[in-house]
């Protein structure tokens, strides 16, 4: 269900896309597709919220499905409703990886590695952005430079580290300059208080950097550098090459070779009905024409793109069934899936063994002990 608040956020885009015509409003039932759903999503105004709104609107028009969007500005605020089954689906970014691995805010006795699965997810692009005057264009140029850093922004920080690893660098090789927020860290480049920062390529505030005298430059990650990409995937499993053409400082004629990741990813509990997941995959795929023109990134929800790995968690069996029918499930994809299942199973088993002796520890000691155990487990299955 698109509420009045949702409609205000979406009205212009959906109207411009021509989605309100009577011909497109004809509805037909789809077997096993729930008549009502609750989706936990990013805050109102975010890209994730707009995309969830557009797709839920399309499902309503095509099948009469009513979707209530439940926005939250925090990682826990999006994942907790899914875990507690107050939401049927969560539209997540890298907090899915954190929850599946039991790291950062999920390295606490109340959480640990979670058993979630994905349906599909849109490709997004990330790298380290720099001022053009800094001369930074590749990972090795980052050594000794002033990097804007937000200590509490785990989802950005975890993607900066693999960019450094591409050139064999770590956080010790850069000068970290702390800022209170993501936007503040990017404005620091405009103000000359930092040389570089981690950022999604389509971040709106970077248009200001692009237009400023300092100019904009992206750290390019050579897609042919196998050693560099292997080093990146040693830090995070979800990294993939992408030639980004949408965003600040890039275009179809001037793409940036950067790190691809998924945002948002449609996520469910592992034990969600296979038939329901299959039905939602089919509905999202077959209603693609109703939402693909809402903005420049919506075409990336095409199943041929959004139904491929890597993701931050393994695919749900219902999603796999649909992808097989679409002839989109290869031997390589199955090998990736098997590895992700093995990884999650090993981490959850290790957590079950770890917890009895770890309860009662101070939070920092608990997290440190679990991270040590997690590192050992992942080393044993690699």
Protein language model annotation of sequence segments:
Residues 34, 201-214, 218, 275-277, ...:
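An extracytoplasmic/periplasmic, membrane-proximal ligand-sensing/linker region
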Residues 47-54, 58, 77, 81, ...:
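Extracytoplasmic/secreted proteins, especially bacterial periplasmic and envelope-associated proteins
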Residues 94-96, 104-106, 134, 171-172, ...:
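Pocket-lining segment of extracytoplasmic ligand-binding domains
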Residues 26-166, 177, 218:
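Short, glycine-/small- and polar/acidic-enriched structural segments
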Residues 1, 21-35, 223:
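C-terminal segment of N-terminal export signals and the immediately downstream linker at the start
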